[in-house]
Amino acid sequence: MIKNFFKLLTNEFSLMIKGSIFTFVLFCLLMIASSIFSLALRHISFDIEIPLAFLWIMIFFISLIKVEKVYASDFSEAKLQQYILSPFALEIIIFVKNIMIYLNLLILFFIFSPIILIILNINLSYLLSINILLALSLLSIVFISSMTSSITISRNNKLSITSVLTLPLFVPILIFSMAISDVIDIDINKLYIFFLAYFLLNLAFSPLLTSFALKKLSV
C-alpha cells in the first residue's frame, strides 16, 4: 500500500512538473494584466486594498483556469475509470492532485510575487504577509475550484459558469485578505487562523463532492 501511494505521489508530481509551463504562462499573463491595471490607474491615488483585491481576484481566476485544465486532462472518461479501479479511493487521488496543483501555483507565485508587487505599487514590506496569506487562501481556492471544475468538465460548461458557481465561496477569502492593510491594528495571526480554518472546512466536503460529481456526472 505504501509503495502504491509513493507511486501515486511520483506520478502526480511528474504531471505537476509537466504542467508548469502552462502555469508559467498564466503568471506571465498576470504580470501583463497587472501592468495594464497600474497604467490605467497611474493618475489615481488609492490605498493598498484596490491593488490587493485585483491581485486576489486574478489569482482566483488563474487557479480556476489551472484546475479546470488539469481536471479536463486527467479526468477524461478513460483515465477516470483507471482512477476508480486503483487501490485508492477517488477522494484520496483528488486530494493529492489538488495539493500538487496548489504547490505548482504557490511556487510560481513566490517567484513572481516581488515583481508583481512592484508593478502594482504595493510596498515590499507587505511581501512576507501577502505570501503567507496567499499560501493559506490558495489552499481553499484550489479545493473550491476542484468542485466546480468537476461539474464543468462533466457538463461541458464554460469557464464563466464555473467562476459564477465558485464566486460565493471565494468572497470570504477576498474580504479577509483586505485586512492585511490593517496589520498594525489587528493580530495578523487571527487572519492566518481564519484562512486555515476555512481551508479545513473546505477540505471536509470538497474531495467528497468532487468525487461524487466525477463519478455521477462523467458517465
Language-model-derived ranges and their functions:
Residues 170-184:
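Hydrophobic alpha-helical transmembrane segments in multi-pass integral membrane proteins
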Residues 70-101:
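Helix-loop-helix units of permease transmembrane domains in multi-pass membrane transporters
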Residues 42-46, 114-135, 181-192:
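Membrane-interfacial helix-loop-helix connectors in multipass membrane proteins
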